[in-house]
Amino acid sequence: AYTVFANLGSRVAPSAIVRVTDQSGAVLWEPRPFVESVLSREEAWIMNDMLRDVVRRGTAYGAVVANGGFRHPAGGKTGTTNEYSDVWFIGYTADIVAGVWSGFDRPKRIM
């Protein structure tokens, strides 16, 4: 879902293969992405602005500062479960979406 925001309202079907090249680097094949508009650019902009605030000054800000700062436009969402037994973050830039989860096999309070 977060890729739609990064792509300004367009859903692009993911591909595990970016491209196929020969030994000299010439591109032999690239996937033709399936693109579908699912949000207006304005709706995507609003979501990006809200999710960027999580990184700029919200609940993810401490992690950004603790790691020397992150100087790229990025957005994301933090979360915790009841009793703080799991914590997670889903973040994105224009190029990548990633998720991080921290928890235990058996419910145990982290914080």
Question: What do the PLM-derived regions correspond to, one by one?
Answer:
Residues 2-111:
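A penicillin-recognizing enzyme superfamily signal
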